Structures are given as C-alpha cells and as structure tokens.
C-alpha cells in the first residue's frame, strides 16, 4: 500500500507523550471508524439511488451487515471537523453514537480521543490523511482493511518489541468486522 509509510509517519508524530499501546488504539480506532463510515456511505448511496426513502432506515443497513453510522459520526463530518480544537471530543461522541446505534458494538470502541495528552492538531492532520476508501466493495475485494490492520499491527508490535500478529489472525479479525 502506497499510503502505509505516510500513515505510519503520522502515527509516529502523534505519539508524543502517549504510550505506543495508547496511540495504537487511537490509530486502529480511526481506521475502524473510516471503514464503517465508508461501508455505510456505499450502502447509503445505493439506497438513495433506489429512491424508496430508506437511506436513514437502520434496518436497511443491518440487513446487509452494514453498521448504521449517524450523521455526527460519518467520516465527512469528522473530516470537516478535523481542524477544530474539539476534534478529540467529536470523535469520542461519534464512537458513542455508533455504539448507541449498533448494540453489538456497545463498549467496544475506543473513546479516549479527548484526553489532554493527545495532540489535537496532529490528530486532525492524521484524519486528513485518511482519504482512501476502506469500506467499498472494491476495497473489500482487495482486502485493504486487512492489509492496513496487518501493517499497523506489525509496526506496533515491532516498535514495542512485542510479537507480530500473524496474517491468519488479521484475516480472522477483519472477517469478524465485516
């Protein structure tokens, strides 16, 4: 992936005063948020094209195993808010809203973006880098999400002196998400 090194450089800059295990959850949480938002957006556009008015019907998404993403948690909203000093709280609120709409995610998503030691300017810059689509059918076919997760888990593991997550485990995790 051509964007891997750029993302890693940003993640490394983001680190600052926080532990690698903490910024790992920041990065992987953003990747997940981008993925479900992209998947939602693709389904949303399909529903709009059908013209039946079901684009805000949660059941229409859940039927296709797509997480419903409320407007305040959609990537376009997050990206437009990236330069605000409150971006950390905006992301935490987005994670809470997603959990509220998707009961099987309750208590799973990270909600630690508003903490003071996380540089909000760098967080906004990281959000700006996420311009690639992770949740489209084409991305799923190319296993972009799996490759991104595998790359980051490998980098986080090697930077912390921990074990490397085998590709089979990454495939399992991504399969569970999808």
What kind of feature is each model-predicted range?
Residues 1-177:
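Non-catalytic, mostly N-terminal accessory regions of nucleic-acid modification and defense proteins
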């Amino acid at each position: 992936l051509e964007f891997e090194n750029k993302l890693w450089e940003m993640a490394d800059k983001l680190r600052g005063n926080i532990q690698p295990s903490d910024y790992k959850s920041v990065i992987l949480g953003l990747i997940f948020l981008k993925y479900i938002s992209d998947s939602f957006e693709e389904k949303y556009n399909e529903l709009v094209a059908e013209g039946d008015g079901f684009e805000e019907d949660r059941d229409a998404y859940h039927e296709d195993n797509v997480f419903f993403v409320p407007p305040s948690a959609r990537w376009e909203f997050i990206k437009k808010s990236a330069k605000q000093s409150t971006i950390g709280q905006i992301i935490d609120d987005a994670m809470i809203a997603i959990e509220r709409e998707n009961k099987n995610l309750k208590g799973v998503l990270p909600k630690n973006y508003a903490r003071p030691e996380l540089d909000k300017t760098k967080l906004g810059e990281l959000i700006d880098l996420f311009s690639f689509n992770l949740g489209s059918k084409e991305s799923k076919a190319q296993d972009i999400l799996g490759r991104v997760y595998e790359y980051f888990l490998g980098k986080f593991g090697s930077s912390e002196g921990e074990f490397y997550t085998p590709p089979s485990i990454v495939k399992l995790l991504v399969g569970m998400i999808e």
